[in-house]
């Protein structure tokens, strides 16, 4: 099962990914948390670009796709194949939103990611840019060149407009516990179908 957590910077993706994984592991489900960009060589290049603005949008797309292909081949597909729940802190919709906000065609970006497995659940944590930026400052970070009100507004609009069948929007202006409860309810819907009789046992544990 593949769960992707998306949203603009400061939406609470990393917090939710960790909390959700703890819940699922607590009921005996093998759960892996990963992120994009990854910590691999391509991902490190992307982080350097995010800090310095060195790459053009087209160059970033090329490196993002290289990073994602390696991620899919080395972790996502193998872990799903063994029955684990994979939780991703960002996935291909982030590339579509951020590079789309930089002026690249959204349809072409989606097509370039056709190789990437589609999430069973895509949790879009929605917050206004002002709140996202406030949270970035509160955690002691300095916003990078992507993290401006104007750019995050464009990214948010693209995230909300994306037509992906598994997308579910969560109001992430709420506290972390409320967001986790909403996310868990959506994940449980898929688990109920995926796990059958075993799912009933797991769901009772999660509900407890």
From Swiss-Prot:
GO terms for molecular function: ATP binding; dTMP kinase activity. Gene3D superfamilies: P-loop containing nucleotide triphosphate hydrolases (3.40.50.300). ATP binds at residues 7-14. The keyword Kinase applies. One of its GO terms (cellular component) is cytosol. The keyword 4Fe-4S does not apply. It holds the Pfam family Thymidylate_kin. InterPro entries: P-loop_NTPase, Thymidylate_kin-like_dom, Thymidylate_kinase. It catalyses: dTMP + ATP = dTDP + ADP. It comes from the Bacteria. Its EC number is 2.7.4.9. Keywords: ATP-binding, Kinase, Nucleotide biosynthesis, Nucleotide-binding, Transferase. GO terms for biological process: dTDP biosynthetic process; dTTP biosynthetic process; dUDP biosynthetic process. Belongs to the thymidylate kinase family. Phosphorylation of dTMP to form dTDP in both de novo and salvage pathways of dTTP synthesis. This is Thymidylate kinase. It comes from Xylella fastidiosa (strain 9a5c). The gene is tmk.
């Amino acid at each position: 099962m593949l769960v992707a957590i998306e949203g603009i910077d400061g939406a609470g993706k990393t917090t939710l990914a960790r909390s959700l994984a703890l819940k699922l592991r607590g009921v005996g489900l093998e759960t892996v948390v990963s992120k994009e960009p990854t910590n691999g060589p391509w991902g490190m290049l992307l982080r350097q670009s995010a800090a310095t603005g060195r790459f053009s949008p087209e160059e970033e797309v090329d490196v993002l796709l290289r990073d994602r292909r390696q991620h899919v081949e080395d972790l996502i597909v193998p872990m799903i194949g063994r029955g684990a729940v994979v939780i991703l802190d960002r996935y291909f919709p982030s590339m579509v939103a951020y590079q789309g906000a930089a002026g690249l065609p959204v349809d072409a970006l989606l097509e370039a990611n056709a190789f990437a497995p589609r999430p069973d659940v895509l949790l879009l944590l929605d917050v206004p840019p002002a709140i996202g930026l406030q949270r970035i400052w509160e955690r002691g970070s300095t916003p990078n060149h992507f993290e401006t009100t104007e750019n995050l507004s464009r990214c948010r609009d693209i995230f909300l407009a994306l037509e992906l069948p598994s997308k579910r929007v969560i109001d992430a202006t709420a506290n972390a516990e409320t967001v986790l409860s909403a996310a868990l309810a959506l994940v449980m819907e898929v688990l109920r179908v995926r796990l059958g009789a075993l799912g009933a046992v797991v769901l009772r544990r999660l509900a407890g």
